[in-house]
Design a protein with these regions (language model features):
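Selected transmembrane alpha-helices and immediately adjacent juxtamembrane segments
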Residues: 1-40, 122-172
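Juxtamembrane helix-boundary/capping and inter-helix hinge elements in multi-pass membrane proteins
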Residues: 39-44, 63-72, 159-167, 191-194
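Transmembrane helix exit motif
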Residues: 58-68, 104-129, 216-217, 239-252
Length: 252
């Protein structure tokens, strides 16, 4: 990959947007910033670039999403599935049909949002389910490994619980801190970034503090209902991006 001014600026903007999402919603919507990166690099290179950056973003975000914002009962059920899913994703990375996974995840996500809209588009409160949490963790682990999009399975489990906006964001933040730290080494083994990618990575670290802080300020200015509606809206954006990636992959 050639390191040009355009590459640096576009990548910096993409990383800033991802950090903004982590500050505002805790995690899970990183895919929103990936289209910017795809303008200047291929998806595999972007994956290698983001793997270490995600760790730095997550650790910085935990300055805002402290232990008091973590839903520990949910994390206790979710995290083992997450690590297991990442393991499956790594072992099957070269054999899985990433396009089919993207399309299936997009369809499931759009159905989930459609059902929420039909039900009145309000914050709900449903009981916890350990089997659902484990399933969501595994699905998130696989999709975050193969498509950097582990957000939808987690959101489909957490949003119906009606957690407070801070607890929702804090729980997703810690969830993806663990997930991104777990998948960093497998991704670097698969991709092996070049010198230019490491240089670009170092430059993009500068976007992290401002991006996370700006997102956190937005989070503080919105109420529970607004945050949840934005999360559902971002799920639609994420699903459409996954659908495009999957369908266009078959057309190439």
């Amino acid at each position: 990959m050639e390191l040009t001014v355009a590459t640096i600026l576009v990548t910096f903007a993409g990383v800033f947007l991802i950090c903004f999402m982590k500050g505002a919603f805790g995690g899970g919507f990183s895919i929103v910033g990936i289209p910017l990166l795809s303008m200047v690099m291929d998806p595999v290179t972007a994956g290698g670039l983001l793997a270490p950056l995600f760790i730095a973003m997550d650790l910085f975000a935990l300055r805002y999403w402290k232990p008091s914002t973590w839903s520990k009962p949910d994390l206790f059920a979710l995290l083992p599935g997450l690590v297991t899913g990442i393991g499956f994703g790594y072992l099957l990375f070269r054999f899985l049909d990433h396009r089919a996974i993207a399309i299936a995840m997009a369809a499931i996500t759009l159905i989930f949002v459609a059902l929420w809209l039909i039900a009145g588009a309000e914050v709900t409160t449903r009981p916890r389910s350990t089997p659902k949490a484990i399933t969501a963790g595994i699905a998130s682990g696989v999709t975050t490994m193969v498509a950097h999009s582990g957000g939808p399975p987690l959101a489909m489990y957490l949003l119906p619980l009606g957690l407070s906006k801070d607890v929702y964001a804090g729980t997703t933040s810690l969830f993806f801190t663990v997930g991104n730290a777990t998948k960093a080494v497998p991704w670097l083994l698969l991709v092996k970034p070049t010198g230019n990618v490491w240089t670009l990575m170092a430059l993009c670290v500068l976007a992290i503090p401002a991006g996370v802080w700006a997102g956190w300020r937005l989070h503080g200015s919105l109420d529970q209902r607004q945050i949840y509606r934005l999360c559902y809206g971002l799920l639609v954006v994420t699903a459409l991006k996954l659908l495009w990636d999957g369908v266009s992959g078959y057309l190439v």
